[in-house]
Amino acid sequence: MRAAIMALLLTTGMAQAAPTSYSLQPEASTVGFETDFGPDKITGRMPVTQADLRLDFQQVSASTIAVTLDVTGAQASFPFAAQAMKGPKVLDSGEYPTITFKSTAVKPDGDGVAVWGNITIRGVTKPAVLHAVIYRQTGTVAGDLSHLTIRLTGSVARSAFGATGWADSVGDEVRLDIIARIARVD
């Protein structure tokens, strides 16, 4: 993201002086996940109910992200998997209807940034790191920072949060692939 942000700044001729607020475009964004299911994969999506995104293009470390996901709206590639995932042995959406992530640090990392933060699943909070890369959205002109796309990737071990149901057939690692389309708040 550092290289992408620097390229964006060089093409604009102006730098942002402080963190800029962005709103999520939920209809164009996806929080995707994947885990192993024997020789197959279970894939799915979860809707975002709230997002507070502040990006600082001069000082990346001043950027902050806070997101809330709706566990009750989760979908999976196998019909029974969504029901099992939301049930008491895995995410327990009746007791814990949301998953939250709040950044604690944003640091340059290769051609992107590492977003350090705390993720809360099933009422258990653990540290997590996501890798992020930022792009201008298709159809925007060079230097236009009003509409951006952020791709975040990472993984969590579901057992660390007590989501241990069907451990004999479903993998522990849940791989995340998040596409967040955002618009600057003026």
Model-derived features: where do they sit?
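Sec-dependent signal peptide recognition
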Residues: 1-7
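Low-complexity, acidic/polar, glycine-enriched regions of mature
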Residues: 17-186
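Hydrophobic h-region of N-terminal signal peptides that target proteins for export
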Residues: 8-17
